[in-house]
Amino acid sequence: MIFIKKLWKFYQKGGIGMINGIKIAPSILSSDFSKLGEEVIDIDKAGADYVHIDVMDGQFVPNLTFGPPVIRCIRKCTELVFDVHVMINKPERYIEDFVKAGADIVVVHSESTIHLHRVIQQIKSFGVKAGVSLNPSTPEEVLKYVINDIDMVLVMSVNPGFGGQKFIPAVIEKIKAIKKMRTDIDIEVDGGITDETIKVCADAGANIFVAGSYVFSGNYKERINLLKLKAK
């Protein structure tokens, strides 16, 4: 039942895929936590495509953020796709909790589990999209045996843990290499995305862009529109 409901809900929202063009996913890690629900509503009104939710455990990455209860609460604020980026050790322990809380896409790090293929299958069994994230120093070769089983690759263009970091240019070659591995794969880039860095990522093959500090430090609508314009 969870599978059917989540799958239908996801496709009603437009799903993911290159045919849907450029998508902007504001990261609420950079939002004002004292009014998180309002922030989610505001980025929805401003034209965001996804809500990017960074889940951190203080072990896999040096920060603590959101868990399923927070996701469940803000799920009531919008129908936007919830792109849940799980940065925790042994993510398989909490996949079902994130799905039940409202995740539409669950992204896990290749570095966070020794059974990556099993976790991908676990995610997809709940009827949501599965993604794999790579840290800046992780080569794209780790995707070789799972790339046909996933819906998205998230390329970290900063070291995970904190918002507001500078973009690492070396990841551009990684984006290009992933695109060659599978031309129809969605490639999301997370870290240091601004109106100055988005174009080079889009030209390399990325189509989904996480922007935290850039969006939340200005006029949300103007910044989201400018990102979409620059990515074309």
Model-derived segments and their meaning:
Residues 2-17:
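Short, Lys/Arg-enriched N-terminal segments with co-localized hydrophobic residues
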Residues 14-107, 111-115, 122, 130, ...:
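Conserved N-terminal beta1-alpha1 strand-loop-helix module at the mouth
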Residues 80, 128, 182-185:
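A short helix->loop->beta-strand "cap" motif at the edges of active sites that frequently abuts
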Residues 129-133, 137:
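Internal catalytic-core helix/loop-beta-alpha segment
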Residues 193-204:
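Acidic, divalent-metal-coordinating active-site segment for phosphoryl/phosphodiester hydrolysis
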Residues 208-211:
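Acidic, Mg2+-coordinating phosphoryl-transfer loop and its flanking beta/alpha structural elements
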